[in-house]
Design a protein with these regions (language model features):
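Beta-strand/loop edge motif enriched in small/polar residues
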Residues: 1-148, 152-198
Length: 198
């Protein structure tokens, strides 16, 4: 199958995994994961045909997102106990173009794939840029009691619960910009969680 994208694909390589999202309203079932077999300008050749119809124009046009990264953080046993990452108060640093796969502990409060936990204003200037978070059992990125964080150009694919989550709802001065979220599935309320909308 060949897919034409609307702009140059800088840094994309043969062998990278991509998703082509559904292009029908209220449909996540049309999203398909494929591997790039060739790149010719804006045309990607995929390892096998797409089964669903994907539109390149209109309100619900498909997105093509790259899930591959050079740096990979993943659980050793995705079928067993999954890992998680957490930045605490006075942490320093950020995340740039890394893949987080098979993380997040299902049904456990505070054990998310990427979690900024009660950092207040100490993370000022920190950012998560270009991350790919894949197959999380407990959200993609959670910002909890943390201010001044930038989350930009990230791809979240398959999550239980909210994908991009401001946990208290009182977090301010954070920027979530140009992120893609695909297939965030309904989860159960977490233990001791006071938020009724989860």
């Amino acid at each position: 199958a060949k897919v034409t994208v609307d702009g140059a694909v800088k840094g994309w390589r043969v062998g990278h995994s991509v998703i082509v999202t559904a292009s029908k309203k209220h449909s996540d079932v049309g999203t398909e994961e494929r591997v790039i077999k060739g790149i010719d300008g804006r045309v990607l050749t995929l390892d096998r045909p797409l089964r669903a119809e994907h539109f390149g124009t209109g309100e619900f046009r498909s997105e093509v997102a790259n899930l591959s990264r050079n740096v990979i953080i993943e659980s050793a046993d995705p079928e067993g106990v999954r890992g998680h990452t957490m930045f605490h108060r006075y942490s320093k640093g950020g995340i740039s173009y890394a893949r987080f796969a098979h993380l997040g502990k299902r049904g456990v409060l505070g054990r998310y794939a990427i979690h900024f936990h009660l950092a207040g204003t100490t993370m000022r200037g920190s950012a998560v840029v270009g991350a790919a978070i894949v197959d999380s059992h407990n959200r993609w990125i959670t910002v909890h009691g943390t201010q001044y964080l930038m989350v930009r150009d990230c791809v979240g694919y398959q999550s239980v619960g909210h994908g991009y989550f401001l946990e208290d709802g009182t977090e301010v001065f954070n920027l979530l910009d140009r992120n893609l979220g695909v297939q965030a599935f309904l989860g159960r309320r977490l233990p001791d969680q006071v938020l009724p909308f989860d």
